[in-house]
Amino acid sequence: AISVIVSFLLMIHQMHRMCCPSIAAHGGTLVKTEADNLFCLFDSVATALAAAQDIVHRLTMVNFVLPEDRHLYASIGIGYGRILNIEDHDLFGDEVNLSCKLSEDIASRNAILLTEQAYVQLTEPSGCLIRQEVSVSGLSLVYYELAN
């Protein structure tokens, strides 16, 4: 059981090492980590989207050399709106909750999903963003998925 835990922790560490350069390259701030979740802030939805695409690309490339049982994937949710940022150590707010819901419960492997609020912030929305709607806990949730 210990070897399984250590293996999982090593995969999380490797994922962090692969993602952090993409976050920094696009001007993002890594605020906190929880297990395999990274909570980041960006100046714009466009830069968050660019970082997300870069992360998926980097993970896809590294998977070519990793054994299949060690492949790394990302499920990314991007939100936009008022948040409470506690000294770059923690984040709270509706859009934080929605983007977490998208990434943890709805997104498939290597999917990038945007909340509706994030989507409307894009000055040049891509035709590659497909509108989706899902019912979660009795609530209707509209989001946009970046087509691969």
Region roles according to the model:
Residues 1-50:
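Catalytic NTP-binding/metal-coordinating core of nucleotidyl cyclase/transferase enzymes
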Residues 41-147:
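Catalytic beta-strand-to-alpha-helix segment of the class III nucleotidyl cyclase homology domain
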